[in-house]
Amino acid sequence: MHEFFLYYIKKKYVIMFKHLISFIKTVYQNYFEIASCLGAVFIILLAIFMDNYLGLEACPMCIMTRYAFGLIAFISFMGVLTNKLYRFNKLLIVLSSLSGIAVTGKQIYLQNLSPEEIANLSMGCGMPLSTQIEYFGLIGGISNAYQGGPTCAAENWRFIFNFAEWGFIFFITFLLLTGIKLIKGR
């Protein structure tokens, strides 16, 4: 009796897993742009929630990460509206993902420095990103913020990974899935 019960439960989980895989394939093949847009918007909303309700302050690199997610959301939404620019939209998502990987990768690098190395960093993350862009111009402000600083090296939140590591994982996922779509065509 006990073995039959275990067999029955195992069979149910296998069927449920097959349905889940089938659902993921359907979403990937038919609703990729909508899923990408919603996923990126969800990540941005989560970051805003963490700022406003958990009292965490976003450093300039975190803001640049949000902009990369925003680009992915916007380009994915435009992909839903315009089917004629399919390859161009996918290429823009790949470029946005690469920029997000660069920013989050640099932030992860900064977070893994020793305290002595962090103390020797420039103050690239000392001012808010908007202030840096106002003083140094768009390219200068982004370049200065990308250099990083002690503020960007701080880990304020962790759920298995910190926010930069989660962002890195999501950007890699966006890059791989979009790259496969770009190579295969539709």
Residue ranges and their predicted role:
Residues 66:
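Cys/His-rich microdomains that often coordinate metals
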Residues 63:
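Cys/His-coordinated zinc-binding microdomains
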Residues 79-80:
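Interfacial segments of multi-pass membrane proteins
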Residues 6-60, 69-72, 83-186:
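Secretory/periplasmic and organellar redox-cofactor proteins
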